[in-house]
Amino acid sequence: MDIFYINLAKQIHRREFVERNFAAVRRPGWGLSRIDAVTAAAARDMPGRIKDTEKACFQSHLRAVEKAQHAAGHVLIAEDDMLLGEGSLPAVQGALAGIAEDDWDILFTDLIIPNAGPMANFYMLRQRLALSGGSQLIDLGNLNFAGATAYIVNHRTRRKVLQALADGSPLDLPYDLQLRKLIRSKILRGHVIVPFPTSVSAFADTSQIQETNLADAVWTAFRRLTWLERDIDAAMKPLAIQKAEPGAEAFARLLTAMQSADYKKK
């Protein structure tokens, strides 16, 4: 499978990191190609209400999806803050083996889940799957999600994906939210692999598109905790200085206790 990663020409350090990371975990049959990202200046005059940086991001992903039309098989499209581990590529292959090619258009390998309830469900599912060493595909048709750091485009339906995204409409939603809209409206079929086969590198802590705030830090920590090869201490470090109010901290302890093997449902 080919990985197409999106990268601005001036972001040399990000490019070098992606290429070193891929070289360290590469498996037979996998390749890596760079997609030259569209700049905010080049996207400025495109119609739509979103910011110029978001327009540029949208057009960069479209450029990658267009290139995917000519690939030999499925393509993993990634931003240049994607992180691969030793088990990432085998995990992707294992997940693909578990779903018929006619049943999906896009498979995410990492996502933002912005709401606490579904976030907890994902975490508990990851815990269960870690014990069995398996993975599970979650249908995104009715789920609130965001992010487009890494996702696989089905070679059988790639034309459909491109046509849905490049329909000539003004760019009024960021790329990830447009994907979510298309999936929730059943125009595209999207799933996410759990545990997440990929994660985000340290570059994700300094977004090129939006300012980082507490919500971003929480979502990034969740993504790293749901990763197949998570490092709990590293994932939580950016949140170490956050002080929870007493009630929230107490409730968090209840949830922690419910994760114990000694906790039995009645």
Question: Model features per residue range: what roles?
Answer:
Residues 1-78, 82-266:
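An acidic/histidine-cluster motif and surrounding catalytic segment
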